[in-house]
Amino acid sequence: DIFDRGPGAQHIMDTVMHYHNVDVQWGNHDMLWMGAAAGNLACMANVIRIALRYANLDTIEDGYNINLLPLARFAMDTYADDPCDCFKPKMGDSDASYDEKSVYLISQMHKAIAVIQFKLEHALIAAHPEYKMADRDLFDKINWEEGTLDLTHTAPNGGYGHHPMLDMNFPTVNHDNPFELTPEEAYVVEQLRLS
């Protein structure tokens, strides 16, 4: 897991590229990065979400020059009045340089890209039932009136029951078509893809 070891994964890859012969066992994060580099939009969103979850933006912004400004603007507009508490980054001592405003912005961006990721993953799951990943599609299992997630049909033995949602503020999720990207989300995805 070269890309699961904190900031600077690009430096490791640059060093490895100069070796004559290398034996690498790729990890799940490496596979996500390869999928993103190959143009898979769900992998791209997942890579960015993980970086935001751990406030590890160096590899994204500095290492690969991926422009996160469209995502930041979208997140600030969409979640302006949302504390995004469930999406605060998990930060270690090395991330102490982030001030409160930066942590809030990262939280907003994390929430925005998480919603986008789940929508993009749905298209893959729906197109490939042989993957047997339908239990990963969750937006259509939310009871918006009660604020619960219905997992009764997601396990082999009948399910895991109903669970209260910790966050119900998803303004870009259309309750009638929860996996559809809004035009603004589609724009963010395209800008990230082009970056």
Task: Enumerate the predicted regions with their spans.
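Feature recognizes metal-dependent phosphohydrolase scaffolds
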Residues: 2-195
